[in-house]
C-alpha cells in the first residue's frame, strides 16, 4: 500500500497550506520561497539516499532562536522528518 500512497495526489487544500507555511517561514528567515523550496528538496534528496522518509509529514522551518552568549536571536533550521524505513547497503 505504501507504494500506492506515493502516487496519490495531495488535496488542493493541503498543497495550499504547505505553500502558505513556506511563504511564512521564508518571510521570517529573510529568504525567498524558492530558496526555501530548494533547501527542502536538497535535504530530501540527501536523506533519501540512506532512509525512506514520509514526505507528507516532512516539516522544515527556519526560525529565530536565542543565541548562546549575548548575540541576540539568530536563524535556526529545524527539520522534522518522519522515517519509514532504513535503506540497507548492498
From Swiss-Prot:
The gene is minE. This is Cell division topological specificity factor. The keyword Cell division applies. The keyword Cell cycle applies. Pfam families: MinE (PF03776). Keywords: Cell cycle, Cell division. Belongs to the MinE family. HAMAP family: MinE. The lineage of its organism: Bacteria, Bacillati, Bacillota, Clostridia, Lachnospirales. GO terms for biological process: cell division; regulation of division septum assembly. It comes from Lachnoclostridium phytofermentans (strain ATCC 700394 / DSM 18823 / ISDg). Prevents the cell division inhibition by proteins MinC and MinD at internal division sites while permitting inhibition at polar sites. This ensures cell division at the proper site by restricting the formation of a division septum at the midpoint of the long axis of the cell.
